[in-house]
């Protein structure tokens, strides 16, 4: 049974363009994988903290030497890592803030890049064989040929970090120009329809 882990980052709820793109993708993925399971991880409701000194102390201490406090410091990180390890496929739905990923998504990344678990002690990624789809909603259009294509930092970063942990099969669906929805120049459904063929292909 294929299992899909869905990581959501936008705080905008039903008004979120990235969440609506993700919703469409998940529906297509479920249709293409009848006997499947979907695990939802909404980072806005996770209580995810940024890396702290106690977290780092626990991170660099061998597991067999962990105190109860160290185990507690890594508890949420362990939970997030387990979700990723148990998934066959990963989809990340995210807006773009100031050309990069939201702070919450960066925090999730810091919690799941774990030496000896998702990243080998030799620096090689351990999550080989998994597939990832990154769904991005951005106000600007950063596709090839755009005069601001060099500002496509978010997709470059996410593809890089996924590769670091061993996920090389990464599909990026970039919903550039999403500000048209917020400005009333396009409907949500109309905007997502422009991505339909890419979403369908990515969901297979």
From Swiss-Prot:
GO function terms (MF aspect): electron transfer activity; FMN binding; oxidoreductase activity, acting on NAD(P)H as acceptor; oxidoreductase activity, acting on NAD(P)H, quinone or similar compound as acceptor
Domain of life, per lineage: Bacteria
Reactions listed under catalytic activity: 2 a quinone + NADH + H(+) = 2 a 1,4-benzosemiquinone + NAD(+); N,N-dimethyl-1,4-phenylenediamine + anthranilate + 2 NAD(+) = 2-(4-dimethylaminophenyl)diazenylbenzoate + 2 NADH + 2 H(+)
Signal peptide: none
Cofactor: FMN
InterPro entries for this protein: Flavodoxin_fold, Flavoprotein-like_sf, FMN-dep_NADH:Q_OxRdtase_AzoR1, NADH:quinone_OxRdtase_FMN_depd
Cell inner membrane is among the record's keywords: no
UniProt cofactor note: Binds 1 FMN per subunit.
EC primary class: oxidoreductase
EC number: 1.6.5.-, 1.7.1.17
Keywords of the record: Flavoprotein, FMN, NAD, Oxidoreductase
Binding-site residues for FMN, renumbered to this chain: 10, 16-18
Family note: Belongs to the azoreductase type 1 family.
Role, per record: Quinone reductase that provides resistance to thiol-specific stress caused by electrophilic quinones. Also exhibits azoreductase activity. Catalyzes the reductive cleavage of the azo bond in aromatic azo compounds to the corresponding amines.
Subunit comment: Homodimer.
Name under which the protein is recorded: FMN-dependent NADH:quinone oxidoreductase 2
Taxonomic source organism: Jannaschia sp. (strain CCS1)
Native organism taxonomy: Bacteria, Pseudomonadati, Pseudomonadota, Alphaproteobacteria, Rhodobacterales
């Amino acid at each position: 049974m294929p299992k899909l882990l869905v990581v959501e980052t936008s705080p905008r709820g039903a008004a979120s363009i990235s969440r609506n793109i993700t919703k469409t993708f998940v529906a297509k993925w479920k249709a293409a994988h009848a006997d499947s399971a979907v695990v939802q991880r909404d980072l806005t409701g996770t209580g995810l903290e940024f890396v702290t000194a106690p977290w780092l102390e626990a991170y660099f201490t061998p597991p067999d030497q962990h105190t109860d406090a160290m185990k507690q410091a890594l508890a949420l990180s362990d939970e997030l890592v387990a979700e990723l390890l148990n998934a066959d496929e990963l989809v990340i739905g995210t807006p773009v803030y100031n050309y990069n990923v939201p702070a919450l998504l960066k925090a999730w990344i810091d919690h799941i890049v774990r030496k000896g678990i998702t990243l080998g002690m030799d620096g090689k990624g351990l999550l080989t064989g998994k597939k990832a789809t990154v769904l991005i909603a951005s106000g600007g259009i950063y596709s090839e040929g755009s005069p601001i294509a060099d500002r496509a930092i978010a997709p470059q970063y996410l593809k890089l970090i996924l590769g670091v942990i061993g996920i090389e099969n990464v599909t990026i669906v970039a919903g550039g120009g999403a500000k048209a929805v917020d400005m009333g120049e396009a409907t949500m459904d109309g905007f997502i329809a422009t991505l339909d063929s890419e979403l369908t292909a990515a969901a297979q």
